Structure formats: structure tokens, C-alpha cells
Amino acid sequence: MTFSVDKVRADFPVLSREVNGLPLAYLDSAASAQKPSQVIDSEAEFYRHGYAAVHRGIHTLSAQATEKMENVRKRASLFINARSAEELVFVRGTTEGINLVANSWGNSNVRAGDNIIISQMEHHANIVPWQMLCARVGAELRVIPLNPDGTLQLETLPNLFDEKTRLLAITHVSNVLGTENPLAEMITLAHQHGAKVLVDGAQAVMHHPVDVQALDCDFYVFSGHKLYGPTGIGILYVKEALLQEMPPWEGGGSMIATVSLSEGTTWTKAPWRFEAGTPNTGGIIGLGAALEYVSALGLNNIAEYEQNLMHYALSQLESVPDLTLYGPRNRLGVIAFNLGKHHAYDVGSFLDNYGIAVRTGHHCAMPLMAYYNVPAMCRASLAMYNTHEEVDRLVTGLQRIHRLLG
């Protein structure tokens, strides 16, 4: 199948609008991607003609809604090549998935004197839950430091492991730098030391295929809204043997086998014991449509197009005076930068006046900002619906801002 960015753009209604009298150039997909009509329509159709509570009744609408929900679980398992659909838990997003692991597996397996390894490039969602866990149990949080080029100092990693290391929690792709970490060697090293591995895949799954069996990670988590799906839905993958051993984190309906006031409560089997309460069924349906949409385009086709676009963008940005780029040459999805001494918010505001949407701030990565000694950065995201013309507009906009502000 030949990838056509024009055909892809036609599926995204918002891309036809104007901002400040100019065509929208949406370069903020790493924060949250836009939604194709196929996703919007699938969720709307479900609410119009097929909505009912799942796992709640024997009537037709409930049975059909339950079947649709479980079919999405199966589709998601194929998307990341899990061994079984029952290794996947529906969560609100990457943040909840990581917190689930920290509060279920973590509370059961991390003790005083143990340690967890993260990196200096992590999103706060892959820092704070582990800080909280370590504070609760008296464990130590160890950090893989950064290199100036935005890669990790992997030579330090072997010395961070010891017999008390319980977990390596690492991002697949940095949400600021676009660095893709060498997971295979990191996971192998962790397993050699008896540690489990959690991978934050929020910035990876939309850019190229992910195979959790080939990676051999123990946990993998991602969000639907960055994958052209709805907000409020994500996937947590856990190896089946681990998942079956994990206790529930939240209590309520759907996650129980029996409830007795005198004899207590027993849990249903995984993954359903981690899905207390009425789920975001509409969001799950929309996620299924997003997975179907991306799969039909072909992740390898998407990867090839986006990489060509990234190479073009990096080469064109070299023409902007006083522009500082952060991260390695080989990267996925994002370009973080600052223009001279101007605050990222000011640069982002000017770009918005030109119809260009970029993200500004610390990007939920304050330790990374501290490493580079800046309060904030601008971040342009490149997704499958972005074009060379939009890159040119970004470059022209930055050149214009430099002329205006000096």
C-alpha cells in the first residue's frame, strides 16, 4: 500500500480549519493526536445505536457491547503481538497503567532496601509513581544519567544493578528528545540481574511496530489519545504469569468473584480484576477504530513517511539563526528547541499567531529540563498527517520571530 499524506489528512476534520486566519499546522501530536473521522464516527455510532453497560446483563445490547469491548482487547493484543488478549488491561492511559503496576506489583514485590532504576529522560508519569512507592516501602530510586546529545549513559547501567534491583522502568521513546532507547539490550541486562522491566510506550506505538514478545518486557503501557484514538483509554500489557499473581489495585464492581460481609471478597481472574467499575466502553470502541485505522495504513509505511519528514525538518531547521535543538540526530516524533534567549512561551505564542500549534513548557520532564539548565522548551511533533509544507511554515515562522525579537 502506498502511503498518501493527502488521503490521510482528508480523514481528519480538524486539519481543514483555520487558526488566526491561517491554515492550522498541528505540530502537537506528542501531547495528543487528532482523531480521524473513522474514530469519531465509531464512538458516536456506539452511543447512538449500541450503548449498554458491559458485563451487566443478558440482554442483546449488553451482550453486543461486551463482545465489541473484548474484540478490541483482542485487536490490541495483535497490535503489540502479545501472546494472549488476557495479558491486556484497559486503563485510562499510560499514567494510570504505571500507577497500577506500582500499586499492585510494586506493593507486593518491592521492600525496604530494594531499588528501582529509571532514567533522567523520563516523563513524570514514569518517575512520580516510583518515587511514591520507594517512599512508602523504604526503597531506593536509581537514575541512568543523560548525555548532552540526548542519549543515555548506558555504560553506567550495569553498575546500577545489584541483587536488590527489582525493576527497570524506562521510556521506549523520550517525549522531549525523541530518543529511542535500545530496549533489547537493556531488558536483557535487567533480566540477567533478576529484575523486571516496565516500558513506557506512550511515544512509540504510533511511530513503528511494537512486538512485546520480541522485546521480552514484563510490562508495556501506552495511551489511546496519542495513537489517534479517544482520551481516557489506554492499554497495560503484563506477562500472563505476572498478571495472574498481581493483587487488584481498586475495588468495586466487575472485579470480584464473590462478596460476603462475613467471609470477605474473592477476586475474578485477570485482566478483569483490574477493571473495577463501569469501563469507558465508548473510548474502548474508539481505540479499536484507531488501531484498525493505523493498521490499515501500515505502521511500516507510517514509519518510512515520518522518518523522511523528520530528516527534512532537521535539515531545514539548520537555517534558523540562534536555534538550539535538543536530542540526537536519529529520533522519533518530536523536535525540542529554544530560540536564542527567548522563553519558549513567547516563541510558542508567536507561532500560534501564524497558525502553528506547538507545545511549550517543561513537558512533564522537569529533571530533563534541569539537566539542560532551561526552564522550558518548545516542542514540535511530527505525525503521519503532517507535511513538508507545514515544516516549511515552522521554519519560516521561527526565522520571522528571530528577526522580530533579535
UniProtKB/Swiss-Prot annotation:
Q: What is the lineage of its organism?
A: Bacteria, Pseudomonadati, Pseudomonadota, Gammaproteobacteria, Enterobacterales
A GO molecular function annotation here is: pyridoxal phosphate binding
**Can you state the subunit structure given in the record?**
Homodimer. Interacts with SufE and the SufBCD complex composed of SufB, SufC and SufD. The interaction with SufE is required to mediate the direct transfer of the sulfur atom from the S-sulfanylcysteine.
What are the catalytic residues?
C364
Q: Which cofactor does it need?
A: pyridoxal 5'-phosphate
Keyword Zinc assigned: no
Q: What is this protein called?
A: Cysteine desulfurase
Keyword Cytoplasm found? yes
GO cellular component terms given for this protein = cytoplasm
Predominant localisation class: cytoplasm
Family named by the database record: Belongs to the class-V pyridoxal-phosphate-dependent aminotransferase family. Csd subfamily.
Reaction catalysed by this chain?
A: (sulfur carrier)-H + L-cysteine = (sulfur carrier)-SH + L-alanine; L-selenocysteine + AH2 = hydrogenselenide + L-alanine + A + H(+)
EC number of this enzyme: 2.8.1.7, 4.4.1.16
Look up the record and name the pathway of this protein.
Cofactor biosynthesis; iron-sulfur cluster biosynthesis
Task performed by this protein = Cysteine desulfurases mobilize the sulfur from L-cysteine to yield L-alanine, an essential step in sulfur metabolism for biosynthesis of a variety of sulfur-containing biomolecules. Component of the suf operon, which is activated and required under specific conditions such as oxidative stress and iron limitation. Acts as a potent selenocysteine lyase in vitro, that mobilizes selenium from L-selenocysteine. Selenocysteine lyase activity is however unsure in vivo.
Q: Which GO terms describe its biological process?
A: cysteine metabolic process
Read off the InterPro entries from this record: Aminotrans_V_dom (IPR000192), Aminotrans_V_PyrdxlP_BS (IPR020578), Cys_dSase_SufS (IPR010970), PyrdxlP-dep_Trfase (IPR015424), PyrdxlP-dep_Trfase_major (IPR015421), PyrdxlP-dep_Trfase_small (IPR015422)
* A Pfam family this chain is assigned to: Aminotran_5
Residues modified as N6-(pyridoxal phosphate)lysine = K226
Which species is this record about? Answer: Escherichia coli O8 (strain IAI1)
Question: What is its subcellular localisation?
Answer: Cytoplasm
